[in-house]
Design a protein with these regions (language model features):
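Glycine-rich phosphate-binding active-site loops on the catalytic face of alpha/beta enzymes
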Residues: 69, 128-140, 195-229
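Glycine/Thr-rich beta-alpha phosphate-binding loop at enzyme active sites
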Residues: 72-82, 119-120, 124-186, 226-228
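Active-site entrance/lid segments in N-terminal catalytic domains of soluble metabolic enzymes
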Residues: 1-127
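Electropositive phosphate-/nucleotide-binding environments in soluble metabolic enzymes
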Residues: 6-10, 47, 167-171, 199, ...
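Glycine- and other small-residue-rich loops at beta-strand/loop junctions that grip anionic moieties
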Residues: 79, 83, 108, 162-166, ...
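Catalytic cores of alpha/beta
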Residues: 45-48, 111-126, 179-183, 196-213
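Glycine-rich beta-to-alpha transition loops that act as phosphate-gripper elements at the mouths
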Residues: 32-36, 107-110, 187-200
Length: 234
C-alpha cells in the first residue's frame, strides 16, 4: 500500500508540468488531486483547501483535472463521495476557480442507486462536473492463507484492494451511472476503472457505458497492456 503521499508544490508542480508537456499525439495526462481533511478543520476550510489545490494544478498547464473523493486511506466511513451535498459544494467552488477546464470526480463504489443519482444531480446537474471516473480500490480485511493479518503493522488490518478482484464492482458502477445519465438526460463522461488487466476488460467497460477506460494495477504489471488493447481496435 502506498496511500496518497504528496511533496510540497515547489516539487510536484514542475514535475507535473513536465509530464503534461511530454504527452505525445493521442496522449493526455489527467492530474488528480484532493483536499486535505485536518482534525479541527471546519466545512469552509475543507472546501477552501480543495480550491487552493485545484488552483495549484491549473498553474501546471493542465487542460483538465480529476478530483479524488474516494481515497481509501481516509477510511470507508469517511469517504467524501458518501456526502454528495458536500461534494456538490466543493465542485462548485473548484469549478469557479478552474474555469472552462473539464472537472472529473473520482468515485468509490456506491451501492445505492438513489445516493448515486443524488451525486449526479448535485454535481453535473449544477454544471460543475463534466465526468466521473469510477471505481477506486475497495476497502477489505486482508488475511493470509492461515487467516492472519496479511499486511504488517497496526491499523493495517484493512486495505484498499485493486486489480482483478474489483472489476465486477467497477463494471456495475459504470453501468448504473450510464443508466442514470440516460434517465436524467444529462451529458457527462464516464471513465471506467478497476480490474482492467486484458483487452476483454476494456471492451466490457465500453459496453457498460464508459466513454474511456483507465488501468492502474494492470498497466503496472503489463507495460504492453495499452498497446494490446489498441491492437484489438484496428
Amino acid at each position: 500500500s502506498f496511500g496518497v503521499p504528496s511533496r510540497d508544490p515547489d516539487e510536484w508542480q514542475p514535475d507535473m508540468q513536465k509530464a503534461i508537456a511530454a504527452a505525445g499525439d493521442g496522449q493526455l495526462l489527467v492530474p488528480s488531486f484532493q483536499g486535505s481533511r485536518v482534525e479541527g478543520m471546519d466545512r469552509e476550510a475543507y472546501i477552501a483547501d480543495h480550491v487552493t489545490t485545484a488552483h495549484l494544478v491549473t498553474e501546471t498547464g493542465a487542460g483538465l483535472m480529476e478530483m479524488n473523493t474516494s481515497c481509501p486511506n481516509e477510511g470507508h466511513n469517511r469517504l467524501l463521495c458518501h456526502d454528495p451535498h458536500l461534494v456538490g459544494e466543493i465542485t462548485e467552488a473548484v469549478k469557479n476557480e478552474i474555469g472552462d477546464r473539464p472537472l472529473i470526480v473520482k468515485l468509490a463504489y456506491i451501492p445505492n442507486d438513489t445516493d448515486l443519482e443524488i451525486m449526479v444531480k448535485e454535481t453535473v446537474g449544477h454544471g460543475a462536473v463534466q465526468g466521473f471516473s469510477t471505481i477506486n480500490t475497495i476497502s477489505a480485511k486482508l488475511v493470509d492463507a492461515n487467516g492472519n493479518q496479511a499486511l504488517p503493522g497496526a491499523g493495517r488490518d484493512r486495505s484498499g484492494v485493486c486489480g482483478n478482484a474489483i472489476r465486477g464492482a467497477g463494471l456495475d458502477m459504470v453501468g448504473r451511472l450510464s443508466a442514470i445519465r440516460e434517465k436524467l438526460g444529462l451529458d457527462f463522461a464516464i471513465v471506467g476503472v478497476g480490474g482492467v488487466i486484458r483487452p476483454e476488460d476494456y471492451k466490457a467497460y465500453r459496453e457498460a457505458g464508459a466513454n474511456a477506460v483507465m488501468s492502474a494495477t494492470g498497466a503496472m504489471w503489463d507495460a504492453n497492456l495499452a498497446r494490446e488493447i489498441k491492437e484489438t481496435l484496428r
